Every structure is written in structure tokens, then in C-alpha cells.
Amino acid sequence: MRRLAFILAVLSTAAAISSNAAFSQQPTQTWITDVTIISPENLEHIAAGTMVIEDGHILRIDRSGPPPKPPAGVRVISGKGQYLIPGLIDSHVHLASVPGMNSDQQAGKSQMIEAYRRQLPRSYLYYGYTTVVDLAVFSQKVLQYVRQSPWHPDVYDCGESLPLANGYPMSFWPAEQRFKQFPNFIYDPAQAAKIPAEYKPEEHTPTADVARVKNSGGICVKIFFERGFADNFRLPVITPEMIAETRRAATQSNLVLFMHGNSFESQKFALAGNVDVIAHGMWHWKDRDRGLDRVLDNEPQLPAEIKSTLDQIAAAQIGYQPTIQVLEGERAYFEPEFLSSSDIAKVVPKELLDWFRSPEGRWFGNEINEDHLPAEQFRKIYDEGPIRRVRQATAYLAQKDANFVFGTDTPSGPTYGNLPGLNGYLEMQQLHNAGLSLTQIFKAATINNARKLKLDGQLGTIEPGKTANFLILSKSPLQTLDAYDSISTVFLHGKPIPRESLSATAVQ
């Protein structure tokens, strides 16, 4: 018996030694050689070089002198003729939302939704987004699902958002449900009679709400200034005192303050409140303070008072997310060829795409076109109205070298026009058409985002010590926008992933 035990021990030890030897033979470093390195903090020095990765981080970069010779036992990847850039950051996503569906449409479609959520993180990676930020967490369960997926971008979040009681976006829910859906709301004493008695004012101050975000692990806080939509512009909005308290609490907790605001009035309010990021472009030009109603909306060029506000936003280096695809995401229902794009099949499962094409799947288009206008007329209203205005405001900020931070608001609502990953590529096209240079877009999606999010110690550039999240492309993003669709390999924490393996068509 002792002899048998001894033999088993010897065999076990030998197996362990063999296993350790095999493990030790695995490459501990990856060398990417002869690749053109483009890093946003060093655009004056773009050159071919070698980058060494170890333990998921960039160990060193050699750009000058004779190329170093990789030692034996390391993994070597040739980057000859290709470009290496930081992984992209989308700082405005909503991971729990399913494009094209509200809660009613989701009923009875669990398998379809499960297939979508399996593909969701892969679709962001497919278009190079190695980091995303969820600005308003509706479901920690979905975020955990994404974080536990085999391949997924790094996920940060703002915790639960801070809507004003009964304001946007609480207003979309029935009165008896909205406080359960948005438990981190800001108490409004002026509406005390409309707030259930179980919610105590002292537990829903901006300070208390920000503390809950901090305790949940959030890196940012999201508030809203939205008077409404269409013919209903009577939603309650936060006061200067509320935003001032939120600003103080966010600063004390070292959290980034985002504010939803897509109007002239709201962006003046954001400027006065010293927010860190304005989450949306300016597609409404009304000035409620002066009672101008739709007069400014109809101005063919940027009015002087709007230019003045945009000048101050640019000078203050407030982060700015135009999110033009929010509007294009609605317009997509009136573009007959939109769902025929081969790009869409790469980011959503076939069963969901088939549903988008069904009469039921077009429900949202019918809802936003209440007057049943012809598609051409609907597109014209958008093109000559809010899309024109947001492009003009964005172009002006681009001329002023404003601090653009890239965010897409994916999906902005129950629309199939904002699909994960692809929506980022389409937003880049919108920004370029609006007047941003290729360099401005590149910086917005990398270093500007990293700095504003206080993640620049880890992300945003190609430098030693940074997380090895980066992309290999066949084209330079400083020369052509379609470089962002020329990705060959996505590196996630130092591990290479062939892009095509991330496509929805690759797993069906």
C-alpha cells in the first residue's frame, strides 16, 4: 500500500513537472514588429517600430534605430504594411437596451434576446471598441453578463442615473412604475404631492444619489435637462441649486459629471453648471428664456447667441458628444435600403435582423411618424430641421477645436437604427460630414475620452505601462475614415482576436 502511494506520488509530481514545463514554454511576451504606430499624443512622430506586450500591458516600444531582434520563445507577429492604434472608446452606451424593442416587444422573445446579448460585446469589438461606458445602468445583471462573456470590451458605468422626479426619462413609464424603475431620482419639493410617500426627501438629494453611484462602483454621474418632445415640452427640469449640489458631490467623489441636453437652453444650463461632458449635440435651438419658441430653430445659420454659448463650451474644454446618429437612428426607418446593408448582418443575429424586417419590427417607425407622412417627406423634415441644426453646431465647435469625446448613445431609444459597434462607425461618418477632421475624430475616440474619464493612466494612447488594448488596421485613420473598417486584429489585454471571428455571421 505504501509502495502504491509512493508510485502515485511520483507520477503526480512528474505530471506536475511536465505540466509546469509545458506552461513555461508558452510565450510570455508578444512582439509586434515593423508596424506603423499611431498614438494620439505623439502624432508628430509616426513611424514603423516594434511593440512588446507582457502580462496584458505594453512593456516597451522601439521606434528608432535598427529593429530589435526578438528573443527565442516569444510570439512574433509581423505588422508590416499595417497600422497600430489604441483601442477605441465609446463613452455613451446602454448595454441593457435591445435595439428596436421596448418591454412590450421583448415579451416572448427570450431566445432572440439571448442571442443578441451573446453577440453584443463581440459587435463592439468587431468595430474596435475595446472600452465602453454605460451612462445609465438599468440592469446590473446585463452588465455582469457582458463582463463575463468570453470576449468583451472593458465596461465602465455611471451607475443608476439621476433623473428629476417625474422628469425625463422617468416620464416614459406609468406613474405607478417609474419610481421603481428609477430609484436614484432627485427629489423635487415642488412635486411632493406627486412622489410616493415611501420616498424620503433626505434620501434623494443629489448628494445621496451621487453617494449611491460611488458605492456601486460607478466612475461617472448622469443627470438630465430635458423639457420634452414633439408638442409636450412641459416636463420638470432640475434647478441651478440641484446641479450645483450634484457638481459638488461628484467632485468630492472624483466622479465625472455627464448631462443629457440637446437644446440651446440645456447646453447653456450645462455650461453654467460646470458639467464635465454634454451628452448630445445641439439640435434644438429654442431659447425658452427669451420666449423665442421656434424662431431660432428656423434660422438658416447659427445665431450669434448660440455661437457665444458654443464659444464658451469650447473654451472651457467641456467634453462634447454630438451623437448625430440619435437622429439618424430614427430616420433609418424611412431609408428603404438601411436593413439591406451587409454590415448589419455582422453585428446582430439573423433572427433579430429578420424580426427588424417584419411588420412588427417596424413598430417604432410607425410611432414616430404619427401623421403617416411619405418616407421622402419624413426624411426632408429631419434633414432640414434637427439634423441640419446639429451639423451646424458641431461644425462650429470643430472650427473652435472643442473637446470632442466620442460617444454614440447606442441605442438612443427602441430603434434598430443604432446597432452596437456599427453605430460608432456611422457616427464617425456623421462627425466627418459635419466638419470634424480625421485627427479630431481619432483623438475623440481615444485620448480625449480617456482623459475626460480619468482613465488616461491605462487607456487612450500607445505607451509603456498602458493596458494592451489596441487595433491592427490595413489603413491609417489619419488618412481615411474607412480605416476603422479595415481592422484585421483586435488586441484585448494583449490577446489577439481576428476581427472576422467576432462577426455575427461567424457564429451562426
How does the language model describe each region?
Residues 196-232, 271, 275, 284-434, ...:
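Active-site neighborhoods of metal-dependent hydrolases
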Residues 82-147, 168-175, 266-273:
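Metal-associated gating/positioning segment near the N- to mid-region
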Residues 37-50, 63-67, 388, 419, ...:
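Acidic, glycine-enriched loop/beta-strand segments at the rims
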